[in-house]
């Protein structure tokens, strides 16, 4: 948590002025009981109305000055707290963006969202409260006790006994509740994760009639969060009754001692009222101080969770730009040299001894069953993950030697899940190349077989895509993501099962258009359809993380049993579909 305070360094002035103005407010507040005592003893007791009005004016003046100081302090505290959280949120977002896929998979999306939102909001609240109360509350507690001694020493001894008792109660409650705060936040992570998963998979859940099962699982995770919050709440609710019992007993003691001394002529009625007011001030400020300490500990727990993310360093370090300039022009476009790879947290290898070479301009097909390692292979080329053994080279250089920006500028990737962002179609396509002309955009749209999609929308390129592309079908999203990658005009184009939602005729037209792209482009097509890859220069057959066959379509039909089984299981069905679609 302490390391996060560097984001307050631009607000040093506010961090000084906020508590300073709160101290000024507290100072004027400590004077109020003495003024009240004077009004009672010197005004009301002798019916001196002018004196009462004068001192009443002093009270109003003290209230106005205190109000001004309070508003000013709140302004500076809010400015510092909001500025702090803004800088912290940006720094955390930037750090998350720098993490590799491996770290992102380990942490989890819902956890990161919680830490970006709920945790940072809690830390912001903690900073605000600290700046306003960390000096004010202790100052009033001790100031009120000192002022009580100036009024009457014997009655003030009650304060000496009361304050330690109150402190024991406050800190006992705090010590019991603090360890539970982290469990509450972890429970919130679970609830948010479950909610996110259900919202994203709502159609699947309903298709399989799993609403009741998901509701039961949500009830369990929500129940855990509720139980933790109830336990914390029960412990926290002990504070007010216990503190009020102690303070009311103390007030009774002050009144009893003060009453005896009033009858003895030692102190006045106004001074007894002042002592009671000081005791009330102590009560209020100790409760505030307790809430502050609880809030601080919540903020520390949340701050530590945020710091945990900052301490996670990306396992992928960018290479030097000097290495980029040393690219071998005649080298293979992509080379896998005995590559093995494991995902974080997995003891088993996801890829084992993958070895192949791809020349520039070649089209490579990758096929295999679900979970065979197809996507894992292509994810190593733009270095989304790192190899555990072997080496991946692009243009003759190890991908680890490349500057990441330079490496990924060479590569266009279309993921399995078509992701579009809120904005116009044009804005989404320009992710590939911000400087692309409109002609280049339409050319990419044509290659991706998305011309009818764009022209059919109101506004065409200006058509507004909703968040996540909710207002587009699966096939439309896939074609637009392919167009976005084509706009980039990369040296290497990777299509990771990105035509799965397209019919056979459209898929065939897409492959034909890709073959006719300008430039010596190297294309990787990951697919479960043999028809999508059978005309590739090389086909890599994946099974259980291993390349069990590499060759052309004809060679693999003769030499690779797995490929032959895949082909024979599909070709009759595909022939029927192609006849219906008129694809070939």
Enumerate the language-model features and the residues they cover.
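Helix-loop-helix
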Residues: 48-52, 57, 147-161, 231-305, ...
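Membrane-integrated ABC transporters
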Residues: 1-32, 36, 44-58, 73-77, ...
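ABC-type nucleotide-binding domain
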Residues: 326-584
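Pre-NBD coupling/linker segments of ABC/ABC-like ATPases
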Residues: 314-329
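An intracellular "coupling" helix at the cytosolic face of ABC transporter transmembrane type-1 domains
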Residues: 10-13, 98-102, 118-127, 131, ...
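Transmembrane helices of ABC transporter permease
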Residues: 10, 14-27, 62, 128-184, ...
């Amino acid at each position: 948590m302490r390391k996060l305070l560097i984001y307050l360094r631009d607000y040093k002035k506010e961090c000084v002025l906020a508590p300073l103005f709160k101290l000024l407010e507290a100072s004027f507040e400590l004077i109020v009981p003495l003024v009240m005592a004077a009004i009672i003893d010197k005004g009301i007791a002798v019916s001196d109305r002018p004196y009462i009005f004068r001192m009443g004016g002093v009270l109003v003046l003290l209230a106005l000055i205190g109000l001004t100081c309070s508003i000013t302090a709140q302004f500076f505290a809010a400015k510092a707290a909001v500025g702090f959280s803004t800088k912290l949120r940006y720094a955390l977002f930037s750090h998350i963006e720098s993490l590799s896929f491996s770290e992102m998979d380990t942490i989890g999306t819902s956890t990161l969202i919680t830490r970006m939102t709920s945790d940072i909001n809690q830390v912001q609240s903690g900073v605000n409260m600290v700046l306003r109360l960390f000096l004010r509350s202790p100052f009033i507690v001790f100031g009120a006790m000192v002022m009580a001694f100036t009024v009457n020493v014997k009655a003030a001894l009650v304060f000496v006994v009361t304050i330690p008792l109150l402190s024991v109660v406050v800190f006992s409650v705090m010590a019991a509740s603090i360890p539970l705060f982290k469990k509450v936040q972890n429970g919130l992570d679970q609830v948010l994760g479950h909610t996110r998963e259900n919202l994203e998979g709502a159609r699947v859940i309903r298709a399989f009639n799993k609403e009741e099962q998901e509701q039961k699982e949500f009830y369990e995770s929500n129940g855990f969060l509720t139980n933790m919050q109830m336990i914390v709440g029960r412990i926290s609710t002990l504070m007010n009754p216990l503190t009020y019992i102690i303070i009311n007993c103390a007030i009774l003691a002050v009144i009893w001692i003060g009453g005896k001394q009033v009858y003895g002529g030692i102190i006045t009625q106004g001074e007894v009222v002042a002592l009671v007011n000081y005791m009330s001030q102590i009560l209020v400020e100790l409760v505030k101080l307790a809430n502050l300490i609880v809030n601080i500990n919540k903020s520390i727990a949340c701050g530590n969770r945020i710091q945990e993310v900052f301490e996670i360093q990306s396992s992928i370090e960018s290479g030097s730009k000097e290495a980029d300039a040393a690219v071998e022009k005649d080298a293979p476009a992509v080379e896998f040299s005995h590559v093995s790879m494991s995902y974080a947290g997995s003891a088993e290898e996801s890829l084992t001894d993958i070895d192949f070479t791809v020349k520039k301009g070649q089209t490579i097909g990758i096929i295999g069953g679900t979970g065979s390692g197809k996507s894992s292979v292509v994810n190593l080329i733009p270095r989304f993950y790192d190899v555990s053994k072997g080496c991946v080279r692009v243009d003759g250089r190890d991908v680890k030697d490349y500057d990441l920006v330079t490496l990924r500028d060479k590569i266009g990737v279309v993921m399995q899940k078509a992701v579009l962002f809120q904005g116009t179609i044009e804005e989404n396509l320009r992710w590939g190349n911000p400087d692309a002309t409109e002609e280049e955009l339409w050319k990419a749209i044509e290659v991706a077989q998305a011309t009818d999609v764009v022209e059919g929308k109101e506004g065409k390129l200006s058509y507004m895509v909703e968040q996540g592309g909710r207002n587009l079908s699966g096939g439309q999203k896939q074609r637009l993501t392919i167009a976005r990658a084509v706009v980039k005009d990369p040296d290497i184009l990777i299509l990771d099962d990105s035509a799965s939602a397209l019919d056979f005729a459209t898929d065939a037209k897409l492959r034909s258009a890709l073959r006719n792209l300008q430039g010596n482009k190297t294309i990787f097509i990951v697919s479960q359809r043999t028809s999508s890859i059978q005309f590739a220069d090389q086909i890599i057959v994946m099974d259980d993380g291993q390349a069990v066959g590499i060759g052309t379509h004809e060679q693999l039909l003769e030499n690779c049993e797995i490929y032959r089984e895949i082909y024979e299981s599909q070709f009759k069905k595909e022939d029927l579909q192609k006849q219906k679609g008129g694809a070939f």
